[in-house]
């Protein structure tokens, strides 16, 4: 039975050594990494970790845009028994300062990142900087190539276990200081197995990596799913090349928050000249126009398109339906990924769907969604009080208010802490009101 990331990496290296796992693009050129090449790089860096640190459990930071060496750095630290702390390339200096200090970070992998000028000013004393290939740092640092070269062909001695702590994913949620959500091999792989079953992912499926890997959704749904399903990941060069890179991948699965789907919508409308022109084209040849748009976007091979992380305006979903592009809604959070998703065979627009297999769901007297399932986080790093508030008797208190319709479909109605009382003493949920305004394409953000 495969219970760790390294189990999957070893399996695909053994069965499909020459199959491409990762594809990077730079302009008109591409760089491919097969399973055997990735396996060699990951294990070489894991061996360097073992040569450098006498004990496991060191905090290892990762600050870079999405690229193959993000995966290599991540999995090498896990393979050596250390704890990866991914950080956003847009995070302000004070946030990265807090995360590095709070976790007692010993190593920081540095790739291309737009916030380096801020981060370098708050680096902890004695931290080891490792520059990923192609990155030059003015500060004293080590180079990836120099570290792995002596160990290529070697294997680390450490044997990963399913309950090993492999990552701290920091999230501030809606209030308070950032909390480090603890993730183990199991708390990553069990939800990924649910995704794979629910989305009917096939072995060798293609994935498109463009959202920040510091976010749990990108890390599990793309990196993790590709590892579990022997998939092929295409990295987006940058957001300005999204419409070029996506058709070159033609993914089987894609995840995006509503804002991404809105931006793609605006791009389509701009190509036609106006929404009226879109309507006229669809009226004249709905099937032909739909096929053309699916192919142009690179979504013609997509088996499952997920929109989540924020409320999706129903009008946006209906708009995509006209092109034969079916957006599915779902719910998850860093503490418990993917417990509720929509399914193609039964979709209700506006609903996040129904609980996935082996997931228990309960609604509290305050209408808060509670989730119990294998694969949830064990809690918050070094925050026992916050852990006790959220994880109670095996139930994760999500902080989201829900309602359930007569057919068992779940709907998010707002956050527990967002409700406020008017001067007349009436409780008001701002989210449904805000959602009405966000259906207007000229509205980007709104707050009541």
Q: Where are the regions a protein language model picked out?
A:
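Structural core segment of the AMP-binding/adenylate-forming
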Residues: 10, 52, 79-146, 444
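Gly/Ser/Thr-rich phosphate-binding loop
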Residues: 252-256, 266-347, 360, 444
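Conserved ATP-binding/catalytic segment of the ANL
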Residues: 355-422, 427, 439
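Conserved AMP-binding/adenylate-forming core of the ANL superfamily
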Residues: 21-75, 92-97, 143-146, 185-186
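Conserved pre-ATP/AMP-binding loop-to-beta segment of ANL
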Residues: 17-20, 131, 151-170, 177, ...
């Amino acid at each position: 039975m495969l219970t760790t990331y390294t189990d999957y990496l070893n399996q695909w290296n053994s069965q499909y050594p020459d199959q491409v796992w990762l594809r990077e693009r730079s302009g008109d050129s591409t760089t491919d990494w097969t399973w055997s090449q990735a396996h060699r790089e990951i294990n070489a860096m894991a061996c360097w970790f073992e040569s450098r640190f006498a004990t496991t459990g060191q905090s290892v930071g990762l600050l870079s845009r999405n690229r193959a060496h993000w995966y290599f750095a991540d999995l090498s630290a896990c393979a050596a028994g250390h704890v990866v702390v991914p950080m956003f390339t847009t995070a302000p200096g004070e946030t990265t300062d807090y995360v590095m200090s709070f976790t007692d970070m010993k190593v920081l992998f540095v790739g291309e990142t737009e916030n380096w000028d801020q981060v370098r000013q708050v680096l902890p004393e004695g931290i080891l900087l490792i520059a990923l290939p192609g990155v030059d740092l003015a500060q004293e640092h080590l180079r990836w190539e120099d570290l792995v070269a002596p160990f290529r062909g070697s294997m680390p001695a450490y044997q990963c276990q399913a309950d090993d702590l492999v990552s701290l994913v920091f999230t501030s949620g809606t209030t308070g200081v950032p909390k480090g959500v603890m993730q183990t091999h199991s708390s990553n792989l069990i939800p990924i197995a649910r995704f794979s079953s629910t989305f009917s992912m096939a072995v060798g499926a293609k994935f498109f990596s463009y959202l920040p890997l510091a976010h749990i959704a990108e890390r599990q749904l793309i990196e993790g799913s590709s590892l579990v399903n022997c998939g092929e990941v295409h990295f987006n060069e940058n957001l300005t090349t999204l419409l070029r890179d996506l058709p070159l991948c033609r993914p089987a699965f894609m995840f995006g928050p509503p804002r991404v789907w809105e931006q793609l919508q605006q791009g389509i409308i701009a190509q036609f000249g106006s929404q009226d022109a879109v309507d006229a084209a669809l009226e004249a040849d709905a099937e032909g126009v739909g096929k053309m748009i699916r192919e142009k976007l690179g979504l013609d091979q997509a088996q499952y398109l997920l929109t989540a992380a924020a409320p999706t305006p129903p009008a946006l979903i209906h708009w995509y339906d006209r092109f034969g592009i079916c957006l599915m809604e779902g719910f998850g959070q860093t503490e418990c990924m993917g417990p509720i998703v929509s399914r193609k065979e039964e979709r209700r627009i506006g609903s996040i769907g129904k609980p996935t297999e082996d997931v228990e769901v309960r609604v509290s007297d305050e209408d808060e969604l509670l989730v119990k399932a294998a694969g949830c986080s064990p809690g918050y790093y070094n925050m026992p009080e916050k852990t006790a508030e959220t994880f109670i008797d095996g139930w994760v208190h999500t902080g989201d208010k829900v309602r359930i319709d007569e057919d068992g479909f779940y709907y998010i109605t707002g956050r527990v802490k967002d409700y406020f009382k008017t001067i007349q003493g009436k409780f008001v949920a701002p989210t449904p009101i805000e959602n009405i305004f966000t259906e207007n394409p000229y509205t980007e953000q709104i707050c009541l």
